[in-house]
């Protein structure tokens, strides 16, 4: 029988919530084999047109500083086929809070790679996609079956699949659902979906611990990228109107600002932008915001709300990105929160429930209904995540350069 150990207490009006640990963390091989025999992956498809792209593919590698990654022959070659993002920053250390941020718009104080579960009243990008029936899926290399929730696989020996590199499995609003876990699949299903033209419009792809450079090095990861991504970019079904982001969860040196090598490729990139660079300040939160702006989706009301949009998307919406002075930006630690080991706080951050946000479509109804009447914990309109209590990134300077034809009086 599965048992749950309560880690945190939920007090609804104060936005306090629960985190739980279950025996799903360490299933037996027999339990895995039994589940694998019956687990059915689910591959919904949709065709919702976007402003700048119709499909987004997010591929993450691991733990490499900008400079070594930029020197890798395979990565630098691919970057020249698209747009090199020279000021893309990860959010924190270690790995797991970055993956969490990519799905939930926040780290919730996470500063560890423990087996954590985020309560079901916290929304994710899955909720945003569902507002317009946009298909989504994750593809995790070497995960034993769709919806697997164990901490790792195989159970012994070298790591291959690890839960900490799987964004949506961290959220109970996903894992407690009857269908959503089946959309978190392995690479076998990826190639099946590719063959049968049943890939979703949003994909998050995680190679195993060998291929992502975590347990090896950037040369191994670069070789994997060449084997995996280069053929896909020649596949018309995969690449047509698709935008592919290749980035890293975090840098390797914790004392560095956490700028990570990132580039965009794919059929959605106009010819005149191929082989160019983009110096705009971006974070992992920028991707959540850009997805919302591209498809006309609401915001999570968290750090995605004020995040800069990918320039390709901003140019389509008319949004003016912030110019950020990155000389003192150090996105290498998190703030107090219920997921923190070193700076624990029982209070969960309250998101914004008002405002248009950078994507321009307001806050998701599920977020507004959950947190109605509560004051947001942070200044989520800022393009730079900062925390006054801990002093993280307080005082970072940013400004906008507005070009107005007639009048700027209506611009805020």
UniProtKB/Swiss-Prot annotation:
Subcellular location: Secreted
EC number from the UniProt entry: 3.1.3.2
UniProtKB keywords: Glycoprotein, Hydrolase, Secreted, Signal
One cellular component (GO) term of this entry: extracellular region
GO biological process, one term: phospholipid catabolic process
Major localisation: secreted
GO molecular-function term, one example from the UniProt record: acid phosphatase activity
Glycosylation sites: 74, 121, 186, 208, 217, 332, 343
Active site location: 215 (proton donor)
Source organism, top-level taxon: Eukaryota
Modification comment: The N-terminus is blocked.
Catalytically driven reaction(s): a phosphate monoester + H2O = an alcohol + phosphate
Name of protein: Phosphate-repressible acid phosphatase
Source organism of this protein record: Penicillium chrysogenum (Penicillium notatum)
Organism lineage: Eukaryota, Fungi, Dikarya, Ascomycota, Pezizomycotina
